[in-house]
Swiss-Prot record:
Keyword list, A-Z: ATP-binding, Cell inner membrane, Cell membrane, Lipid transport, Membrane, Nucleotide-binding, Translocase, Transmembrane, Transmembrane helix, Transport
UniProt free text on domains: In MsbA the ATP-binding domain (NBD) and the transmembrane domain (TMD) are fused.
Domain named ABC transporter: residues: 345-581
NCBIfam families: MsbA_lipidA, PRK11176.1
Disulfide cysteine pairs (residue numbers): none
Binding site residues for ATP: G379, R380, S381, G382, S383, G384, K385, S386
Gene encoding the protein: msbA
Protein family according to the UniProt entry: Belongs to the ABC transporter superfamily. Lipid exporter (TC 3.A.1.106) family.
Name the UniProt record assigns to this protein: ATP-dependent lipid A-core flippase
Length: 585
């Protein structure tokens, strides 16, 4: 292992240690139990010497006390090993479970604090793999790997002590062999760490590919994309297989190499034992104990070689998790907090570029939206309409200019307080795998009564279909409302915004998924909702925004026209052209 890799492993483990040491009581019990379990092998071997030496001249020479007590020693030793094995396994599994749970919670909570721009750049499948696969690798490093390291380490120390106690001359060969074995383990550890990192990335690709197919299953079927997805998944899964085989190959090579090195020690012991100088001093019991202990070292050495790969996988995964946790969370430097804003919005010379793009999405955009008024944004797709809505809620920060709410720049508000002032109904509705009632009252706790939820659903014209559901408002709707139609999902999103009763309302294609009849019904409810509120409407259907106090036409990130519906029609510009296209005038 290179010095940098060693330092990386050490630094990672130092950072992981507080998670483990928090449960030091369980860890201490487990370590003590592991040491007791490991020393059982040493105790078993130590009994060989008195048995052989005392019976060297025949069974009649065996001391009756020792022989009579042997069955009790063996039974007691087996019980002790069994009990210590159970205690160590249970305690370490408990500790590792707690550690992984806290890591997962920490990562999950950190993801919720990350800016939207982070998720624009990252694959959701890869991030899911970090929470699931990578954290499980950490569990291996803190449970089974730690079990092997402590138990086999104690076994090696115990067996070596037994060997030197009985014959330091025969055991001295270990002083030569041990550094060679240690060097070999360091070499394979470097290889294990590199492969483990590649396996994490490969698993992220597998998860991402599978997630894309599952979420886009209807599109795959509609366009006959089965072969495309099959080839994509075949490629990433084969890459995962290749990385796994590289790890297996490294393990398969490392084990016999370590055992061959250790076997030289056995050969040297046999040669030395055959020399006249030592032969006169050795008893059968001494030789059997030393040779048996040296042979017994094979198993823990092999186990330590195997566990090195497991430990390095855990450390590589842990390093990745900590790197994600170290990413800067969404900035929230605002101090201003208010119970309810009036809703007066001013946008002054705002320019904004998405982090993943090179060209600005908005260029020097300016407009005023007085409190209680309605402003509509229209234009072709990709012109920058929804971007303005994202900036009002500070999902992104502007490059230049000013974005003002009630006389204060939005960056001066506490993020949570700012977003409490705004209710958003987007064309991309997200619902949770929960009841209809809990989706409408999402994240509100006990702030709203059942009657409040029903009223919001009524205003959104959602009760018509809710009453037909098996359990009404208590019906589970599946992941992202999979059991509902597009229009039904949109109505629940509108009900959620109605219940929130925020002073600023953003309707981003809010009725795009509704049929004409439902749109008319909801439009009436939305018009009622808009009273005494500041409303920003983003729409393709011009019929929904004809009554707006002001309409802005956005094209390529710039406002090219502004005015009321009548003024823009009279102007006979871009808006009038859009109107003619939609209504066939």
């Amino acid at each position: 292992m290179t010095q940098s890799t060693e330092q990386s492993t050490l630094d990672t483990y130092k950072r992981l240690w507080p998670y483990i040491s928090f449960y030091k009581a369980g860890l201490s019990v487990a370590v003590v139990a592991l040491i007791i379990n490991a020393l059982g092998d040493t105790l078993m071997l130590s009994m060989i010497k008195p048995l052989l030496d005392e019976s060297f001249g025949g069974l009649d020479n065996i001391e009756s006390d020792f022989l009579s007590m042997m069955p009790y020693y063996l039974v007691g030793l087996m019980i002790l090993r069994g009990a210590s094995g159970f205690v160590s396994t249970y305690c370490l599994s408990w500790v590792s479970g707690k550690v992984v749970m806290n890591l997962r919670r920490g990562l999950f909570n950190h993801f919720m604090k990350m800016p939207v721009s982070f998720f624009d750049k990252e694959s959701s499948g890869a991030l899911l793999s970090r929470i699931t696969y990578d954290s499980e690798q950490v569990a291996s490093a803190t449970s089974s790997a730690l079990v092997s390291m402590v138990r086999e380490g104690a076994s090696i120390i115990g067996l070596m002590a037994l060997m030197f106690w009985n014959s330091w001359q025969l055991s001295a060969i270990l002083l030569v062999i041990a550094p060679v074995v240690a060097f070999s383990i360091r070499l394979v550890s470097k290889r294990f760490r590199k492969i483990s990192k590649n396996m994490q990335d490969a698993m992220g690709s597998v998860t991402s590919s599978a997630e894309q197919m599952l979420k886009g299953h209807k599109v795959v079927l509609s366009y006959g994309g089965q072969e495309v997805e099959k080839q994509r998944f075949d490629s990433v899964s084969n890459n995962m297989r290749q990385q796994t085989m590289k790890l297996v190959s490294a393990q398969a090579i490392a084990n016999p190499v370590i055992q061959v090195i250790a076997s030289f020690a056995l050969v040297v012991v046999l040669v030395l034992a055959n020399s006249e100088a030592l032969r006169a001093e050795l008893t059968p019991g001494t030789f059997a104990v030393v040779f048996g202990a040296m042979f017994g070292l094979m198993r823990p050495l092999k186990a330590l070689t195997n566990v090195t790969s497991q430990f390095q996988r855990g450390m590589a995964a842990c390093q990745t998790l900590f790197e994600l946790m170290d990413l800067e969370a969404e900035e929230d430097n605002g101090k201003h907090k208010i119970a309810r804003v009036n809703g007066d919005i001013q946008v002054k010379n705002v320019t904004f570029t998405y982090p993943t793009k090179d060209t600005p999405a908005l260029r020097n955009v300016s407009f005023d939206l007085p409190a209680g008024k309605t402003l509509a944004l229209v234009g072709r797709s990709g012109s920058g309409k929804s971007t303005i809505a994202n900036l009002l809620t500070r999902f992104y920060d502007i490059d230049s200019g000013e974005l003002i709410l009630d006389g204060r720049e939005v960056k001066d508000y506490q993020l949570s307080n700012l977003r409490d002032q705004v209710a958003v109904v987007s064309q991309n509705v997200h619902l949770f795998n929960d009841t209809i009632a809990n989706n409408i009252a999402y994240a509100s706790g006990d702030s709203f009564s059942r009657a409040d939820i029903e009223k919001a659903a009524e205003l959104a014209y959602a009760m018509d279909f809710i009453k037909g559901m098996p359990k009404g408002l208590d019906t589970m709707i599946g992941e992202n409302g999979v059991s509902l139609s597009g229009g039904q999902r949109q109505r629940l999103a509108i009900a959620r915004a109605l219940l929130r009763n925020a002073p600023v309302l953003i309707l981003d294609e809010a009725t795009s998924a509704l049929d004409t009849e439902s749109e008319r019904a909801i439009q009436s409810a939305l018009e009622e909702l808009q009273k005494d509120r500041t409303v920003l409407v983003i729409a393709h259907r011009l019929s929904t925004i004809e009554g707006a106090d002001q309409i802005l036409v956005v094209d390529d990130g710039e406002i090219i026209e502004r005015g009321t519906h009548g003024e823009l029609i009279k102007h006979d510009g871009a808006y009038a052209q859009l109107h003619r296209i939609q209504f066939g005038d």
